[in-house]
Design a protein with these regions (language model features):
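A short acidic, Gly/Pro-enriched loop at the edge of an enzyme's catalytic core
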Residues: 41-53
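A short SAM/SAH-binding and catalytic strip from SAM-dependent methyltransferases
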Residues: 51-66
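Class I SAM-dependent methyltransferase SAM/SAH-binding core
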Residues: 1-41
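Conserved class I S-adenosyl-L-methionine
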Residues: 81-110
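Core SAM-dependent methyltransferase catalytic element
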Residues: 133-135, 143, 148-164
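A structural alpha-helix within SAM-dependent methyltransferase catalytic domains
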Residues: 18, 69-73, 127, 131
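A short glycine-rich, Lys/Arg-flanked "PGG" loop and its adjoining helix->strand segment in the class I
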Residues: 66-81
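Short alpha-helix
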Residues: 116-140
């Protein structure tokens, strides 16, 4: 069977995930870890390299995503797959500063009590995180919701290439 390591910066989110997945606790190791802290990320290492890694709608919430991509590359086996989804930088962050990384505040879920901070990165910056860490992009999807023609989300499949 698969061995799964799930992490989040928030202990509250980890507690909710453990409760939600209580019947799988013997198959999932839940950890509190900061995606910008290489030491914490590398502590997630198991006996063998991981075959796959997934980040669902988190990259835009991370101040500096470089440590995450660097560590995912280190933790994956050669040929391993990293799939991540994030806000579409062309259509969600409507800004005249598209090429310049910056933060901004917005609502994620209708009715939330206050705006949250997001970190805008251009497509070339997002792809550079992959390329600079030994990944090739072998899949790319732009997802829209509610019949809209403009996509809200990008889903990237990156494959770790063998370095030798």
């Amino acid at each position: 069977g698969a061995r799964v390591v799930a992490f989040d910066y928030s202990a509250n989110m980890i507690a909710l995930a453990q409760k939600r997945q209580s019947r799988y606790l013997d198959h999932i190791r839940f950890c509190v870890a900061d995606a910008t802290d290489e030491e914490q990320l590398m502590a997630l290492r198991g006996e063998k390299p991981f075959d796959k890694a997934v980040s669902n709608m988190a990259v835009m919430d991370i101040t500096d995503a470089a440590p995450l991509f660097r560590c995912v590359s280190c933790l994956l086996a050669d040929g391993g797959i990293f799939v991540f989804a994030t806000q579409h930088p062309c259509f969600v962050t409507l800004t005249d500063r598209y090429l310049t990384p910056h933060s901004y505040y917005d609502i994620a879920i209708e009715g939330q009590p206050q705006k949250q901070c997001y970190y805008h990165r251009s497509l070339q910056d997002i792809f550079a995180l992959c390329f600079d860490n030994g990944f090739v992009i072998d899949g790319f999807l732009e997802e829209s919701f509610g019949g809209k023609e403009k996509p809200d989300v990008i889903i990237v499949r990156a494959k770790k290439i063998a370095r030798g």
